């Protein structure tokens, strides 16, 4: 095993994001732009550090493209900028579950309670052409999806969602 650092034009880095691959490109969604969240409850997971773009990276050419998520419905755009979503790719579809972050609609930090299906082929094409991305996301809302920091896997035709937790309100690394 060997690892080599690579610089991607226009990409500053992310933390705790979801990733998929399509057409030899990486698709990055969610996470934080400010590195590890701060440990003080009043400052942890500030909305200012949310990743508010869907980013496409071509690792061969070292190019990147992005599209903002502000025009998506709030329930989708808020979840897409959360941290530690569970994610799994099946074919041309990326599934995103839960994630933790600030919700303007709730007026507080929440663990999101939905599953979002992302159509990768259309999304990548739209982002590279500077088009609209709205039609490439579908969402199902159910409290069963309110998880962050879990893992999802697939054995045969069955998906398994394991572990994780649900935080409501400001995250406190020192306990309740």
Predicted regions and their residues:
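Beta-strand-rich domains and repeat architectures in extracellular enzymes and scaffolds
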Residues: 4-52
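Glycine-centered tight turns/hairpins at beta-strand boundaries that repeat
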Residues: 22-41, 96-106, 159-175
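Beta-propeller blade signature
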Residues: 42-63, 108-129, 174-176
């Amino acid at each position: 095993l060997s690892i080599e650092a690579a610089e991607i034009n226009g990409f500053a880095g992310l933390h705790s994001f979801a990733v998929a691959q399509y057409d030899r490109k990486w698709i990055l969604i969610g996470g934080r732009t400010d590195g590890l969240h701060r440990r003080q409850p009043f400052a942890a997971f500030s909305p200012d550090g949310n990743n508010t773009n869907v980013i496409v990276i071509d690792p061969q050419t070292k190019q990147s493209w992005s599209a903002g998520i502000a025009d998506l419905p709030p329930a989708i755009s808020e979840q897409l900028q959360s941290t530690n979503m569970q994610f799994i790719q099946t074919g041309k579809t990326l599934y995103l579950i839960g994630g933790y972050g600030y919700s303007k609609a709730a007026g507080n930090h929440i663990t999101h309670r939905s599953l979002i299906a992302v159509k990768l082929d259309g999304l990548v094409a739209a982002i590279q052409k500077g088009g609209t991305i709205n039609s490439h996301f579908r969402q199902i809302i159910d409290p069963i999806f309110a998880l962050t920091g879990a893992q999802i896997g697939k054995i045969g035709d069955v998906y398994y969602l394991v572990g994780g937790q649900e935080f409501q309100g400001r995250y406190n690394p020192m306990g309740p």
